[in-house]
Amino acid sequence: KMAVDVAAAITEATQDPAIKAIIVTGAGRGFCAGADMNNLNSLSKAGGGKGVSQAVGAPDFIANDPDVDPAFKNPVSYFPAVPKPIIAAINGPVAGMGLALALHADIRIAARSAIFTTAFSKRGLIAEHGTSWMLPRLVGQAAALDMLFSSRKVTGEEAAALGLANQCVDDDTLMDSAIAYARMLADQVAPRSIKIMKQQVYAAQQQSFGEAMDLANREMVESLKTDDFKEGVAHFLEKRPPNFPNV
């Protein structure tokens, strides 16, 4: 149910032109502890993989878009295909599938009480939902293997030191920090620029340097034709806040 609710909320936020950034956080004392242990117990008694394929996939606006990489149409991994920035405010324990969800966010802000753990190895499972792809890109191969093998607990402060979190803040300032970052993006940055740069960064993970340069050159030509570029120059010269058009 959580995955369905998240997909519905992401869809609503993406389709609302007034929303420029999306914050995902947990209800209660934790961000997301992963799969329900009772469900895992039922799966193990039923012989394993039955029912796994029934997990909710990407929202329809992503799943039905032919221009989206199929890799970003799976459960959890669709966050990179969302055209708006997604900020994960990690407010407590985050494990397993919950960690995968956080890894696919664009920005992660952790509370000091946050605890990150992969948990997979202690459940007899493997790195699911793209964790083996995303985690090394954030913390490096050695740290990723350590976290995956040991399933040890990583604090919010260590997560920031590793690059797993962009910031570590006091618990009582977590949401204020996330909202301030989202508001900064909404007030100062062109939504189209964020959309295109997000596409560039995730595409570059599977491109050669030359392919990434070619894409950048094509997108720069298109950017110079936009009202965003005109406004970007105008507000700087006129020394006023920008008024960028919505995507």
Residue spans for each PLM region:
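CoA-thioester-processing core
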Residues: 75-83, 89, 95-149, 162, ...
